[in-house]
């Protein structure tokens, strides 16, 4: 049987990959994917702690479903914003997203 430490290490690796993608990437789609990867790492932590700490309660699973719902809404809104900026600027480079400059 897998231990809690295994899930925590996997979640930490996923979160670090997401942070790396968030810092390094200049593409808006990759940034959104990195944020989703970080949220999935958080969900893995919720599920692991819910299973190993108190397996009788389902609070971790319920909160994980809530985070998945919010992440789906965030992805939809983020992609809509990126699509709108792409139609105006013809690029999805994060450096050109500064809409306050003329």
From Swiss-Prot:
Enzyme class: translocase
Domain of life: Bacteria
The keyword NADP appears for this protein: yes
Topology in membrane: Multi-pass membrane protein
Pfam family, one: Oxidored_q2
Coiled-coil annotated residue ranges, if any: none
HAMAP family found in the cross-reference section: NDH1_NuoK (MF_01456)
Function: NDH-1 shuttles electrons from an unknown electron donor, via FMN and iron-sulfur (Fe-S) centers, to quinones in the respiratory and/or the photosynthetic chain. The immediate electron acceptor for the enzyme in this species is believed to be plastoquinone. Couples the redox reaction to proton translocation, and thus conserves the redox energy in a proton gradient. Cyanobacterial NDH-1 also plays a role in inorganic carbon-concentration.
Protein name per the record: NAD(P)H-quinone oxidoreductase subunit 4L
